[in-house]
Amino acid sequence: MALTTERVKLFFEWFLFFGAIFIAITILYILLVLLFEVPRYIKELVRCLVEYLTRRRVWMQRTQLTEATGDVEIGRGIVEDRRDQEPAVIPHVSQVIPSQPNRRDDQGRRGNAGPMF
């Protein structure tokens, strides 16, 4: 009877030991996930906050301008998005490469073995 009690005690000691190791590994894993994932969420949150504040500032400027002038059309001239503030790239004529369509007489010189219709 005493031998069985010792075995049960030993079993529970080992069970608690491995359980404690499992819990410690789980806690370390959670801490590592928090260490690497929370900065991403904070970065995304800051980006959304800045975008919201920028849109709100533009909206307030537009509203104040409309109230000051009484003209609704003036408020539409304010740029709503930063992407609109970038200068447009317009290619010069020298940068444009004209496309040359393939003529029928060119097809024979290209070594094309297909039928010519």
Curated annotation (Swiss-Prot):
Disulfide linkage: none
Keywords for the protein's UniProt record, in alphabetical order: Host cell membrane, Host membrane, Host-virus interaction, Inhibition of host innate immune response by virus, Membrane, Suppressor of RNA silencing, Transmembrane, Transmembrane helix, Transport, Viral immunoevasion, Viral movement protein
Membrane topology type: Single-pass membrane protein
Disordered: region residues: 83-117
Keyword DNA-binding included in the entry's annotation: no
Physiological role: Transports viral genome to neighboring plant cells directly through plasmosdesmata, without any budding. The movement protein allows efficient cell to cell propagation, by bypassing the host cell wall barrier. Begomovirus genome is shuttled out of nucleus by Nuclear shuttle protein (NSP) and the movement protein transports the DNA-NSP complex to cell plasmodesmata and facilitates further movement across the cell wall.
Protein name: Movement and RNA silencing protein
Gene: DNA-M
